[in-house]
Amino acid sequence: MANLQKYIEYSREVQQALENNQPIVALESTIISHGMPYPQNVEMATTVEQIIRNNGAIPATIAIIDGKIKIGLESEDLEILATSKDVAKVSRRDLAEVVAMKCVGATTVATTMICAAMAGIQFFVTGGIGGVHKGAEHTMDISADLEELSKTNVTVICAGAKSILDLPKTMEYLETKGVPVIGYQTNELPAFFTRESGVKLTSSVETPERLADIHLTKQQLNLEGGIVVANPIPYEHALSKAYIEAIINEAVVEAENQGIKGKDATPFLLGKIVEKTNGKSLAANIKLVENNAALGAKIAVAVNKLL
């Protein structure tokens, strides 16, 4: 444990929250470095952190800077992450190398879960999880997020899986791995930009307090792995399923034609979707993350009250 702590650096706010047993919610950093252009990425990150504070919890955005796993970012850290041109996108396989080489790294869903667990943080808010890519039966392109969800004990609040993915196969994978996927006020898996996907959920709850009960019970039963809380984008910000699917299909063809795959595929596709929707998808992305941040903070606060 002493060896681990030499690699971890807490922001002043997070350090104080840990000392005072306050509820903490982790945030990923790939959305800042690879998911949105500057300065929207900084504005979004600071707004989301404030939403978490407004709902009674402390935000902890996670990134790797100068050989340290930063749990909570100071403003100068955020600027480095948002403006650097060579930020590595870090998943489980890359974590040791990026820390050892003292590079700047942005954490994916998988790595944010790992680092949150190292720091004792049980809740993590993101836009959408990764999953099984379309055509994975030929390419085997499956996000490491799914494997991480099967073994790391962090509850992830998201707007479902990213809509560029094969959602039925993603759900099959999570079911095989024993990962609970719980809809928040919905019986259908949300698909990031849209509230509906056509994929039905077996579990749905209506309140943050009920999610807190499930989180704590799972923990007390020593069941390995995370929980996915699927929180649909608010009605007023959702895009239509037919509209976004047509645009995604165009973007997928462009990626294939340009030979873009692996970890580069998601940023390319999301960038193309922003371009083809004239920025509507970027606005929707920001709103769904804000919505997830409010719910994540409420769940963390509800769990803290039960302890």
UniProtKB/Swiss-Prot annotation:
GO terms for molecular function: hydrolase activity, acting on glycosyl bonds; metal ion binding; pseudouridylate synthase activity. It comes from the Bacteria. This is Pseudouridine-5'-phosphate glycosidase. GO terms for cellular component: cytoplasm. The lineage of its organism: Bacteria, Bacillati, Bacillota, Bacilli, Bacillales. The active site is at residues 28, 162. Belongs to the pseudouridine-5'-phosphate glycosidase family. One of its GO terms (biological process) is nucleobase catabolic process. Catalyzes the reversible cleavage of pseudouridine 5'-phosphate (PsiMP) to ribose 5-phosphate and uracil. Functions biologically in the cleavage direction, as part of a pseudouridine degradation pathway. Binds 1 Mn(2+) ion per subunit.
